[in-house]
């Protein structure tokens, strides 16, 4: 850590200690909390999801509060606050990245990391009024949080603000990528109503200053162990105390406060730091990760840790009570086989430039500690390249990936890998060369691993793998006598179909916002064998109609499919509040050496809204 960064952190910690806690109705702080709990200690411990000895340890944290009316703990994370303007140099991270952030800034409030997941984390940047919750009281019946704002114009969102929102969402989504949860910036359901998060989610409201109502400098505040219980919604994150909305600070604070909602407490150390800053390139999410490239959940495996709670076990504990249902989050299902025998086969495509070379690609997630994802492919003998891409750094250069991989390449039936790739002091990414000794079946294993500063415990997250290798020879066919004329090779096909869609209903900004409509659709390109095709170029247009909105076609837009063969379309007409419909039309589809099979595709898609 640079000396200037150390100075900033020292100033923050000292300022927090001297500031004193604000006077919030029904809340007592730190050293006064134990006395206020009194004989209710067993109930308070149960509400916090801990035993009594652990509760007594938690009460030594000067940022802990006790809500006497609800017998609940809350954290006011004053030591997460950062002086305005104290923007650090970008944390070091890999320059090699996976798919870039969405460049369509209209998507900023329609983002989803895992649509349809049974749990949701809502990142609310557009302003929020909190009423009827544990945060409210007779003297504070409503808490009005302004929108996320950099330029002093809260009624509209600038391009810079939208880019920051997308960057923050992407980082928080990576922090929770191992779980079956949708991290989303879409705050309303299809009818335009606020999402009901009872028994399924939590909201983080990101905007304004802690001095707007809390009354002291804090990076965020949240009730403990209250995921899925809307009476304790939301968690508050205060950009004004986070480098004036600096994305790295905001996403670290957001994941930290949501961690409290999931039952997690602070990761500090035994040498006087309530919030650990980690070591080397790593820091715990429940400490302070502002100046480290890699932040992860923890179980106290770092030096001098004062908190040994198992973050992943707490988050996935099926007995945790929400409102009436139990189980905060589950791990997301394993997406690829975890052994050589269960390896997912890759169907490669010879390159147009050199048919003697074949490419193949896949995307994966390391969901559990020590998880391994296995892929298989048939190749000829010769040089091969295996490339890894992780969640990319933010546009301002701050790393966001959580997973470190050890990559192994195996030959079929071998007792040891042909090659192992595992960088020290940095996350594995980029191209890795290996020589395949003979034609045959080979395997790639991507394994979550640790590094000098952290273990494999929470080395979890998304990645993509791309391979280039010698094209395997086809088995020779017997030649009858006389030999018939050779048959033409079967045509390769692209079949483009609708994978999923939703009608997106939202609200505009300003004093009298109108209802807005849009279509969010995911399409997938596959070959005749059902294998996803990456790099397919698709041009599409959209036609809109409603009772008060004249029929109109949008300009044609070109999309390119990802490594999973998919791309997302988001289209919306001008603001309208009447019933209507949208028709998306595929105009062209191309990817060498394939031919578009229009009859087996879905070239025209019509969607309606009430």
What are these regions (language model features)?
Residues 352-385, 397, 428-432, 443, ...:
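Non-catalytic, beta-strand-enriched accessory regions in extracellular/secretory proteins
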Residues 380, 488-520, 526:
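Beta-strand-rich domain onsets/edges
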Residues 428-432, 440, 555-573:
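Glycine-centered loop-to-beta-strand initiation motif
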Residues 115-119, 133-134, 138-270, 275:
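Active-site-proximal segment of zinc-dependent metalloprotease catalytic domains
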Residues 403, 526-553:
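Short flexible loop/turn segments that cap and initiate beta-strands
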Residues 17-150:
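Primarily auto-inhibitory N-terminal propeptides
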Residues 303-347, 375, 398-401, 406-415, ...:
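C-terminal edge strands of extracellular/lumenal beta-sandwich accessory domains
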Residues 385-392, 513-530, 569:
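Beta-strand-rich structural segments
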């Amino acid at each position: 850590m640079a000396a200037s960064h150390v100075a900033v952190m020292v100033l923050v910690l000292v300022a927090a200690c001297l500031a004193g806690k604000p006077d919030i109705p029904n809340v007592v702080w730190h050293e006064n909390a134990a006395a206020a709990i009194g004989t209710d200690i067993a109930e308070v411990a149960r509400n916090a999801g801990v035993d009594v000895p652990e509760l007594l340890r938690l009460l030594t944290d000067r940022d802990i509060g006790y809500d006497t009316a609800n017998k609940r703990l809350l954290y006011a994370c004053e030591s997460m606050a950062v002086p305005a303007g104290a923007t650090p140099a970008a944390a070091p991270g890999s320059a090699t990245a996976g798919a870039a952030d969405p460049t369509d800034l209209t998507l900023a409030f329609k983002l989803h990391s895992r649509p349809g997941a049974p749990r949701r984390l809502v990142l609310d940047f557009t302003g929020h009024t909190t009423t009827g919750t544990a945060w409210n009281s007779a003297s504070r019946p409503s808490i009005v949080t302004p929108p996320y704002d950099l330029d002093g114009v809260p009624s509209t969102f600038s391009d810079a603000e939208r880019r920051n929102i997308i960057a923050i969402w992407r980082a928080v989504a990576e922090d929770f990528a191992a779980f079956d949860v949708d991290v989303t910036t879409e705050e309303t359901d299809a009818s335009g109503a606020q999402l009901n998060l009872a028994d399924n989610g939590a909201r983080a409201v990101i905007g304004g200053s802690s001095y707007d109502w809390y009354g002291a400098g804090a990076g965020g505040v949240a009730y403990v162990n209250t995921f899925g219980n809307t009476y304790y919604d939301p968690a508050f994150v205060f950009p004004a105390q986070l480098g004036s909305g600096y994305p790295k600070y905001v996403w670290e604070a957001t994941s930290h406060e949501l961690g409290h909602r999931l039952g997690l407490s602070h990761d500090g150390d035994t040498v006087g730091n309530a919030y650990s800053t980690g070591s080397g390139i790593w820091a715990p999410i429940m400490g302070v990760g502002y100046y480290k490239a890699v932040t992860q959940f923890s179980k106290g495996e770092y030096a001098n840790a004062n908190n040994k709670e198992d973050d992943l076990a707490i988050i996935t504990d099926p007995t945790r009570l929400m409102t009436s249902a139990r189980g905060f989050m589950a791990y997301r299902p394993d997406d690829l086989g975890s052994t050589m025998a269960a390896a997912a086969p890759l169907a490669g495509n010879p390159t147009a430039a050199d048919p003697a070379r074949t490419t193949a690609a896949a995307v994966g997630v390391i969901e559990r500690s020590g998880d391994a994802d296995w892929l298989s492919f048939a190749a000829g003998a010769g040089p091969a390249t295996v490339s890894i891409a992780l969640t990319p750094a933010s546009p301002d250069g701050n790393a966001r990936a959580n997973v470190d991989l050890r990559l192994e390449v195996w030959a079929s039936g071998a007792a040891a890998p042909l090659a192992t790739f595992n960088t020290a002091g940095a996350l594995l990414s980029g191209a890795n060369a290996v020589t395949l000794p003979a034609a045959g079946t080979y395997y790639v294993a991507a394994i979550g691993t640790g590094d000098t500063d952290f273990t494999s415990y929470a080395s979890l997250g998304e990645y993509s793998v791309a391979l280039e290798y010698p094209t395997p020879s086809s088995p020779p066919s017997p030649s009858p006598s006389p030999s018939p004329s050779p048959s033409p090779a079967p045509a390769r096909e692209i079949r483009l179909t609708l994978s999923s869609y939703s009608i997106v209903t939202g609200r505009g900004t300003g004093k009298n916002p109108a209802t807005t409509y849009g279509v969010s659709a995911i399409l997938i390109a596959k070959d005749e064998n059902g294998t996803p095709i990456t790099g397919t170029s698709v041009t599409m247009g959209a036609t809109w109609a409603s009772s008060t909105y004249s029929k109109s076609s949008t300009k044609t837009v070109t999309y390119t499919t990802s490594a999973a063969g998919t791309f997302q379309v988001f289209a919306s007409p001008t603001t309208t509040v009447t019933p209507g419909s949208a028709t998306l039309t595929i105009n062209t589809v191309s990817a060498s050496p394939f031919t578009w099979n229009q009859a087996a595709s879905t070239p025209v898609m019509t969607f309606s809204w009430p």
